[in-house]
Design a protein with these regions (language model features):
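Active-site metal-binding loops of divalent metal-dependent hydrolases
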Residues: 100-101, 208
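Conserved phosphate- and dinucleotide-binding cores of soluble alpha/beta proteins
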Residues: 11, 18-24, 44, 77, ...
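Alpha-helix N-cap/helix-start and coil->helix boundary motif
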Residues: 103-104, 123-126, 235
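Ser/Thr-centric signal marking residues that sit
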Residues: 34, 101-103, 117-120, 182, ...
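HTH-adjacent hinge/linker in prokaryotic transcriptional regulators
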Residues: 2-8, 14-22, 27, 33-99, ...
Length: 251
């Protein structure tokens, strides 16, 4: 499976810091063209960079500022979106809250005495949920990824199979008609894909800067979401698409 192989290549590179193309080809038993395509995908994801004869990892410390920057961009809009979406959380719900700089505001507007279940891979959601007296909390993911402040791991899907999720609150770095909801992190994309395929309802929380954009990896078709929470009326094509597919839009 390509996604699993790329995940394993990423893990290998992060552990060893550098690798030659031939070393990777032999280790993963694929053709030179296949390994080059895999490398190009990791380069596009800003995980590795090409050097003479091979690749080397881009350290997370060089990318951490990106999260901090995202966290302050359109911060007021993200709070408004969080408040709008919080109205969807009801007693006895079993919900998934995605990692992201918009979804982190969701719990700020929920009654702290409400009884419901949260499943998440977000460190920020974990910290906020700990303040809720009547919440049952499940954390997925085998290792912590500082750049996204999330827990990741390819085996998370095995745990997710056990959960019946009625509402998923998702984030995205791109929202458009052709490529749906997208992001740029392979490990997170696998979890997002599984969650949106399993949840009864999928809600996207995304500000206007994400609309019309597409990034590396699609995890959900736009037609598969149930509600969109944003800060401005979406572009005409997206708004018309939502009307056509009975997707409620809140802003």
């Amino acid at each position: 499976m390509k996604a699993k192989r790329i995940y394993e290549i990423e893990s290998f590179i992060k552990e060893n810091k550098t690798a030659s193309i031939e070393e990777l080809r032999q280790r993963f038993n694929v053709s030179i063209n296949t390994i080059r395509r895999d490398i190009n995908q990791l380069v596009d994801m800003n995980i590795v960079k090409k050097v003479y004869g091979g690749i080397e990892v881009i350290e997370d410390s060089h990318k951490a500022v990106d999260y901090n920057k995202r966290n302050i961009e359109n911060s007021n809009s993200k709070k408004i979106i969080g408040e709008l979406a919080a109205n969807e959380i009801e007693a006895n719900d079993i919900i998934y809250i995605d990692t992201g700089t918009t979804t982190i505001h969701l719990l700020d507007y929920v009654d702290k005495h409400l009884t419901f279940t949260i499943i998440t891979n977000s460190l920020d959601i974990l910290n906020k949920a700990s303040q809720f007296k009547n919440v049952t909390l499940f954390i997925i993911g085998e290792k912590y990824k500082p750049i996204t402040r999330s827990f990741i791991g390819i085996d998370s899907n095995m745990l997710l199979e056990k959960f019946n999720i009625n509402k998923s609150f998702m984030s995205a770095t791109g929202v458009n008609i052709q490529n749906g909801l997208s992001n740029s992190e392979m490990e997170e994309n696998l979890i997002k894909q599984y969650i949106t395929s399993k949840a009864t309802e999928t809600f996207i929380l995304a500000d206007h800067s994400k609309m019309g954009k597409s990034t590396l990896l699609t995890y959900c078709d736009l037609s598969d979401i149930n509600k969109m929470f944003t800060d401005k009326i979406p572009p005409k094509d997206i708004n018309a698409f939502c009307q056509e597919h009975n997707i409620a839009v809140y802003f």
